[in-house]
Amino acid sequence: MRVLIATDAWRPQINGVVRSLERMVEAAPEFGVTPHMLTPEGFWQVGLPSYPDIRIALATRRHVARRIAEFGPDHIHIATEGPIGWLTRAICLAQKHTFTTSYHTRFPQYVAARWPIPESWSYRFLRRFHGPAAGVMVSTATVEAELRAHGFERILRWGRGVDLSLFHPRPESVLDLPRPIFLSVGRVAVEKNLEAFLSLRLPGSKVVVGDGPARADLQRAFPEAHFLGAREGEDLAAIYASSDVFVFPSLTDTFGIVLLEAAASGLPVAAFPVQGPSDVFAGSEAAVLHEDLRSAALSALRLPREAGLQLAQRHSWHSSAEQFYGHMRRAMQTAAAGKAARVEPAPASTALSVRLEPAEGKEFA
């Protein structure tokens, strides 16, 4: 099965969407899948207003169609609702090609945190985007319930995983700071609610790993905190294992892969009792979820570190990829069955056919 994944979120961005898609690409051969990423890479790009580190593609439908046709996918998955996502969606609809989508971000809440735009407007925008999809993949039951309450249909569950070979307890600390060390990892942006963590009266040290548009302002406002910038791989894993409590102040995440990474590292978690943490830690003793984040952080110091390890072992990227590609195969089978029922001529290939036009002048590639 040849699968094209269209996404506006890709390297050099570091976030849960990119990490999830990278893991799906890595696991693809295990499921007989040949993946291809359609990303902003290769197109002219511009920084997103209020978030210049995120680059969006200045692409045209013709040039996106050319990229799709060159690969010849059996199935298309659209991961994001940006320019790449909308153009790919338009091509799929024009060619009557089955596609799936995924819902990674609580877009209405993110928009409302930055601009005075009613959430109802954002949900209307999202329903239009995801409505024609054969299935909309979401990470948790809570996200599924939220979308159903706003009129979404054909919702599919797609869980997330953690790399236990990378994220695990380590005997030596790489952080020479007063203890206890309270750690937060993620994008440093207003929607992550980091100020709720940094303003807490806590003993020891506060450490923030990540980068983003709010970093400079937060560093000025909280000079006692340690901002380490973006970290990945062994460097990031060692920081997790060197800390004492992971504090997750976000109120808008759909899941939070960093929660699993912290748990796998033996790090107790403190968070608000909201969507994301409530789903990940349901029935687990690996976290303290409380409206008083300071109380949660201090209580988390007393949690058994083994609880997080037990939780993390139930989440593998292999099972995540099995769900991901399984949904696509079933979408293809359902579409094929529908065509057979209508007695339509069977195509020579399920690959997408796109009429190509010669480029005129300089193209966006």
Identify the meaning behind each predicted range.
Residues 216-234:
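Nucleotide-activated donor-binding/catalytic signature segment of Leloir-type glycosyltransferases, i.e.
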Residues 98-100, 109-128:
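Nucleotide-sugar donor phosphate/pyrophosphate-binding loop at the beta->alpha transition
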Residues 124-170:
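Donor nucleotide-sugar binding/catalytic pocket of nucleotide-sugar-dependent glycosyltransferases
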Residues 251:
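Aromatic "clamp/platform" in nucleotide-sugar-dependent glycosyltransferases that forms part
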Residues 268-271:
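Short hydrophobic beta-strand element within catalytic cores of glycosyltransferases
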